[in-house]
Amino acid sequence: LLHLLGSGGFGSVYKAIYHGATVAVKKVKRCSKNHLASRQSFWAELNVARLDHNNVVRIVAASTCTPASQDSLGTIIMEYAGNCTLHHVIYGTGYLTGNNSDSLKCDHGFLSTAQAVIYSHDIVAGLMFLHSQLIVHLDLKPANIFITEHNVCKIGDFGCSQKLEDSESSGLYICHQGGTYTHRAPELL
């Protein structure tokens, strides 16, 4: 592990090297208050494990084998999508996790209308692909849209996602209370 990129409700993400490639490693913590929710989050992340799309963060590997000394349910190794999220660009926060290291700096500057259209196209393409695979993200927000060094948006953080069995039987009945309250769709409030 090279350094911490960020942390959230169910774990921490680190920049690392795996078989010579730069990756992001998510360690899903064992939540003592809500063990079921942390387990569900770990397995939900793996909904996209076999998928490959330019606008979706790719899962490289995963393991539930962790040392007993660690308070972890498992580890997920993902492609490294970069230091910057759409949240950083929209709100002008240029550093990850409050660290002022140049290696963690996000230098995207002002978001022009033209760039917003390009980013929107990337996000819609990723969502269309996920929906074609019967996966709903359920926590789509600027902080979960990563911007690569090639200026491509990738949807990440699938800890709240659901894989639908088939579109006819479950497409209209998504009942979900996770995700970020301030970014929920109105029909889920």
Swiss-Prot record:
The keyword Transit peptide does not apply. It comes from the Eukaryota. InterPro entries: Kinase-like_dom_sf, Prot_kinase_dom, Protein_kinase_ATP_BS, Ser/Thr_kinase_AS, Ser/Thr_Kinases-Pseudokinases. It holds the Pfam family Pkinase. Keywords: ATP-binding, Kinase, Nucleotide-binding, Serine/threonine-protein kinase, Transferase. ATP binds at L5, G6, S7, G8, G9, F10, G11, S12, V13, K26. Gene3D superfamilies: Phosphorylase Kinase, domain 1, Transferase(Phosphotransferase) domain 1. The keyword Transmembrane does not apply. It is an enzyme of class 2 (transferase). Its EC number is 2.7.11.1. PANTHER family: SERINE/THREONINE-PROTEIN KINASE TNNI3K-RELATED, V-MOS MOLONEY MURINE SARCOMA VIRAL ONCO HOMOLOG. This is Serine/threonine-protein kinase mos.
